[in-house]
């Protein structure tokens, strides 16, 4: 433009007149705005001047009058401070997020806090800033066309901004915990960055957001990194993100996306993942392991109390528990009226064999078998020597089982053997048979006494081929621990056993099977029933049944078409026949009438 003015007088004259007009208009508007803005913004000036030691209003006026066009804009940026983005309101924001929520979400908000409120550079339609910016751009063009006065002024302003940024950093280093100063410094640094951007013209407007964001995050990261070292030195000052009163929480949440692992995750997790103490780990182990009521007693007696006597109160409590358990089982039989309850018996047998094998592993079986006739005190003494209290529990539970069977419970439907029958059978076993080495006399009464589900066996020798080996005929007593857990078993328990055997009498069925017939008659009837049942299972179905079913399927639609002739003797069938005929006649008449109506010409 200036080069063209050198060649032709007309162009230079046109340019000079344009320059004079534009300068006169701009100067008039500048003077109006200059008088309006300081009057409106005196209280906010006082606030900002109190908070930061930057340029005063008089310095800005002098700089503007000296020829710097950006000084007035910088004053306007400082004056028009939106209340919604001020540091006072940010300190009052209630952050209702716990540490876990902050760690999960990591504060991923789509709109950062800077975008929610209009920033200094946003141009509102009809606002003073839009006019100011247009005027400043016009002034930039005029200054470029004229001479290079403003270059020196711009350099001076850049120096001022660098000095301001240095002052901001010094303030942050001096007072790291002051929230208001940090917020105001961030806003001042942001505004100075905006001014340096606006010097570059229209290119800055295109890349406005791209250049804004790194500066803001840089300021925020400085505050975050300077806030972090105190928590490392002092463990007490760990700050929870949900603590609204702490300054650290507000400062570290300066911008979304700037939260690092150090700010959000590190310290709360350090508090949570403290090493377990010995007591805590011990309690955890005790919770994981299934409770076995005998183990703590054995550990105490073996390790800590080698010479002391066992706790008699605990022994009596265990005996009482077993008596109650046997009573419960017998009551369940009585309530069911002799119905099969095989699950309870299987659990009892599993528990019994597990206890026996555990005692065998400890090598105490011989001493237990030798103490069959010992009293309760001798068994208690053996307990003090490290033998688990198996024998005494079994003896007491056996006595409780016998007494509850005989005296406590009436037996209207249950055919369990009485106490006298058990004593007689025990005498027979002592006389004739030798007991197996691993069975006590009062533990199951030997392998000859076969316990069946209550009321299920009938005393008949039906299945001689199902005889089991000798060691599987165990008596299931109620001496199982109340908290027996079969998950802890390391071995497979085989509790299946034959209901009857062909050489031993099933003493469960000493009572009358049926009061209409004698026991030999009942046995004969059962034998005949078994023979008939085998015949019925072996006979194949006849072919006539198959033929009849197939003929029904094939001839079904044909029978519908030609129904069979009704019997004349049935009045109901005759009525149905007459009604059907009447319906057919009615349908025929309707068809005839419709045909006549269609053939007839209809006159309108």
Curated annotation (Swiss-Prot):
<dbReference type="GO" id="GO:0007291">
    <property type="term" value="P:sperm individualization"/>
</dbReference>
<dbReference type="GO" id="GO:0007283">
    <property type="term" value="P:spermatogenesis"/>
</dbReference>
<dbReference type="GO" id="GO:0007288">
    <property type="term" value="P:sperm axoneme assembly"/>
</dbReference>
<keyword id="KW-0221">Differentiation</keyword>
<feature type="region of interest" description="Disordered">
    <location>
        <begin position="359"/>
        <end position="387"/>
    </location>
</feature>
<keyword id="KW-0966">Cell projection</keyword>
<dbReference type="Pfam" id="PF13879">
    <property type="entry name" value="Hmw_CFAP97"/>
</dbReference>
<dbReference type="InterPro" id="IPR029488">
    <property type="entry name" value="Hmw/CFAP97"/>
</dbReference>
<feature type="compositionally biased region" description="Acidic residues">
    <location>
        <begin position="288"/>
        <end position="300"/>
    </location>
</feature>
<feature type="compositionally biased region" description="Low complexity">
    <location>
        <begin position="368"/>
        <end position="379"/>
    </location>
</feature>
<dbReference type="GO" id="GO:0005929">
    <property type="term" value="C:cilium"/>
</dbReference>
<dbReference type="GO" id="GO:0005737">
    <property type="term" value="C:cytoplasm"/>
</dbReference>
<dbReference type="InterPro" id="IPR038791">
    <property type="entry name" value="Cfap97/Hemingway"/>
</dbReference>
<keyword id="KW-0744">Spermatogenesis</keyword>
<dbReference type="GO" id="GO:0050910">
    <property type="term" value="P:detection of mechanical stimulus involved in sensory perception of sound"/>
</dbReference>
<dbReference type="GO" id="GO:0044458">
    <property type="term" value="P:motile cilium assembly"/>
</dbReference>
<feature type="compositionally biased region" description="Acidic residues">
    <location>
        <begin position="135"/>
        <end position="183"/>
    </location>
</feature>
<keyword id="KW-0970">Cilium biogenesis/degradation</keyword>
<comment type="similarity">
    <text>Belongs to the CFAP97 family.</text>
</comment>
<feature type="region of interest" description="Disordered">
    <location>
        <begin position="544"/>
        <end position="585"/>
    </location>
</feature>
<comment type="function">
    <text>Involved in assembly and/or maintenance of motile cilia. Required during spermatogenesis for axoneme elongation. Necessary for optimal function of the chordotonal (hearing) organs.</text>
</comment>
<protein>
    <recommendedName>
        <fullName>Protein hemingway</fullName>
    </recommendedName>
</protein>
<keyword id="KW-0963">Cytoplasm</keyword>
<feature type="compositionally biased region" description="Acidic residues">
    <location>
        <begin position="8"/>
        <end position="38"/>
    </location>
</feature>
<feature type="region of interest" description="Disordered">
    <location>
        <begin position="1"/>
        <end position="70"/>
    </location>
</feature>
<feature type="region of interest" description="Disordered">
    <location>
        <begin position="103"/>
        <end position="309"/>
    </location>
</feature>
<feature type="compositionally biased region" description="Acidic residues">
    <location>
        <begin position="194"/>
        <end position="214"/>
    </location>
</feature>
<dbReference type="GO" id="GO:0043204">
    <property type="term" value="C:perikaryon"/>
</dbReference>
């Amino acid at each position: 433009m200036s080069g063209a003015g050198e060649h032709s007088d007309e162009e230079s004259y046109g340019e000079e007149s344009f320059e004079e007009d534009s300068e006169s208009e701009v100067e008039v508007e500048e003077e109006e705005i200059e008088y309006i803005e300081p009057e409106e913004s005196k209280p906010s000036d006082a606030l900002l001047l109190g908070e930061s030691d930057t340029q005063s209003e008089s310095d800005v006026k002098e700089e503007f009058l000296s020829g710097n066009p950006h000084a007035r804009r910088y004053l306007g940026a400082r004056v028009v401070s939106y209340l919604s983005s001020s540091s006072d309101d940010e300190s009052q924001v209630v952050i209702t997020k716990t540490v876990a929520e902050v760690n999960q979400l990591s504060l991923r908000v789509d709109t950062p806090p800077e975008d929610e409120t209009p920033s200094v550079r946003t141009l509102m339609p009809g606002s003073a800033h839009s006019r100011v910016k247009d005027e400043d751009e016009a002034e930039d063009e005029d200054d470029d066309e004229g001479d290079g006065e403003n270059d020196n002024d711009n350099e001076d302003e850049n120096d001022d901004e660098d000095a301001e940024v240095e002052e901001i950093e010094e303030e942050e280093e001096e007072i790291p915990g002051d929230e208001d100063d940090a917020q105001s410094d961030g806003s001042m640094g942001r505004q100075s960055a905006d001014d340096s951007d606006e010097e570059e013209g229209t290119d800055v407007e295109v890349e406005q957001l791209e250049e804004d964001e790194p500066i803001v995050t840089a300021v925020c990261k400085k505050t975050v990194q300077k806030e972090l070292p105190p928590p490392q030195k002092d463990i007490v000052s760990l700050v929870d993100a949900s603590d609204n009163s702490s300054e650290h929480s507000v400062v570290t949440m300066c911008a979304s996306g700037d939260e690092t692992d150090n700010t959000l995750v590190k310290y709360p997790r350090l508090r949570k993942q403290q090493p377990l103490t010995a007591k805590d780990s011990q309690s955890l182990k005790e919770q994981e392991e299934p409770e076995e009521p005998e183990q703590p007693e054995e550990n105490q007696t073996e390790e800590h109390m080698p010479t002391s006597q066992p706790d008699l109160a605990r022994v009596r409590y265990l005996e009482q528990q077993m008596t109650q358990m046997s009573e419960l089982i017998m009551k369940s039989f009585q309530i069911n009226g002799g119905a099969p309850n095989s699950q309870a018996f299987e659990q009892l047998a599993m528990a019994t064999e597990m206890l026996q094998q555990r005692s065998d592993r400890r090598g105490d079986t011989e001493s237990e078998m030798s103490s069959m006739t010992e009293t309760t005190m001798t068994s208690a003494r053996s307990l003090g020597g490290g033998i688990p209290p198996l024998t005494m529990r079994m003896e007491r539970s056996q006595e409780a089982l016998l007494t509850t069977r005989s005296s406590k419970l009436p037996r209207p439907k249950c055919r369990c053997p009485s106490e006298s029958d058990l004593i007689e059978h025990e005498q027979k076993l002592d006389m004739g048979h030798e007991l197996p080495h691993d069975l006590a006399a009062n533990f199951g009464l030997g392998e000859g006494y076969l316990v069946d589900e209550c009321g299920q066996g009938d005393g008949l020798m039906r299945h001689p081929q199902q005889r089991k080996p000798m060691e599987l005929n165990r008596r299931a007593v109620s001496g199982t621990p109340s908290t027996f857990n079969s998950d802890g078993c390391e071995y497979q328990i085989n509790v299946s056993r034959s209901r009857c055997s062909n050489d031993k009498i099933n003493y469960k069925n000493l009572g009358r099977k049926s009061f209409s017939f004698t026991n030999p008659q009942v046995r004969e009837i059962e034998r005949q029933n078994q023979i008939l049942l085998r015949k019925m299972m072996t006979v194949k179905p006849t072919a006539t049944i198959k033929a009849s079913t197939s003929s029904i399927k094939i001839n079904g639609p044909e029978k519908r078409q030609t129904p069979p002739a009704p019997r004349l003797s049935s009045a109901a069938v005759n009525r149905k026949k007459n009604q059907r005929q009447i319906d057919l006649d009615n349908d025929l008449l309707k068809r005839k009438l419709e045909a006549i109506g269609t053939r007839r010409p209809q006159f309108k």
